[in-house]
């Protein structure tokens, strides 16, 4: 199987979730190979560690690629203290890391 770079998407928390007092930001990587991919979360350019969770789907039988979602979970109060949310993806198929981001309040 040849190397395939992931497509990367970022999703802000939903209004419904924020009403419940938490905020999950999701970074989604689709259709990549090999499985090794690294996701780093940055909030206002500060690297986050420890409050994100990753799950990788097993190889897709149709085209032998993987998908991965990484979820950064914060309290609503923490989420509202910061503005720029970004996930940075490193993968063999990418010549340089790919960053997807959004500004809170501009979605």
From Swiss-Prot:
Give one GO term, molecular function aspect: antigen binding
CDD domains tied to this protein: IgC1_L (cd07699)
Location in the cell: Secreted; Cell membrane
Keywords noted in UniProt: Adaptive immunity, Cell membrane, Disease variant, Disulfide bond, Immunity, Immunoglobulin, Immunoglobulin domain, Membrane, Secreted
The parts of the chain that form a coiled coil are none
Which cysteine pairs make disulfide bonds?
A: 27-87
Q: Which InterPro entries match?
A: Ig-like_dom, Ig-like_dom_sf, Ig-like_fold, Ig/MHC_CS, Ig_C1-set, Immune_Resp_Modulators
Q: Where is the Ig-like domain?
A: 6-103
What does the record list as GO biological process?
A: adaptive immune response; B cell receptor signaling pathway; immune response; immunoglobulin mediated immune response
Chief place where the protein resides: secreted
- Gene Ontology CC: blood microparticle; extracellular exosome; extracellular region; extracellular space; IgA immunoglobulin complex; IgD immunoglobulin complex; IgE immunoglobulin complex; IgG immunoglobulin complex
> What PANTHER family does the database record attribute to this sequence?
TAPASIN (PTHR23411)
Summarize the subunit comment: Immunoglobulins are composed of two identical heavy chains and two identical light chains; disulfide-linked.
State the function annotated in the UniProt record. Answer: Constant region of immunoglobulin light chains. Immunoglobulins, also known as antibodies, are membrane-bound or secreted glycoproteins produced by B lymphocytes. In the recognition phase of humoral immunity, the membrane-bound immunoglobulins serve as receptors which, upon binding of a specific antigen, trigger the clonal expansion and differentiation of B lymphocytes into immunoglobulins-secreting plasma cells. Secreted immunoglobulins mediate the effector phase of humoral immunity, which results in the elimination of bound antigens.
| Disease affiliated with this protein | Immunoglobulin kappa light chain deficiency: A disease characterized by the complete absence of immunoglobulin kappa chains.
Q: Kindly provide the name given to this protein in its UniProt entry.
A: Immunoglobulin kappa constant
């Amino acid at each position: 199987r040849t190397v395939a770079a992931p497509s990367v998407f970022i999703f802000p928390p939903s209004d419904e979730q924020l009403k419940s007092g938490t905020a999950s930001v999701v970074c989604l990587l689709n259709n990549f190979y090999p499985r090794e991919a690294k996701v780093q979360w940055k909030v206002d350019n500060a690297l986050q560690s420890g409050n994100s969770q990753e799950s990788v789907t097993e190889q897709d039988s149709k085209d032998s690629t993987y998908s991965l979602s990484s979820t950064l979970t914060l309290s609503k109060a923490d989420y509202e203290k910061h503005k720029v949310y970004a996930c940075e993806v490193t993968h063999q198929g990418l010549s340089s890391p790919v960053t997807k981001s959004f500004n809170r309040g501009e979605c």
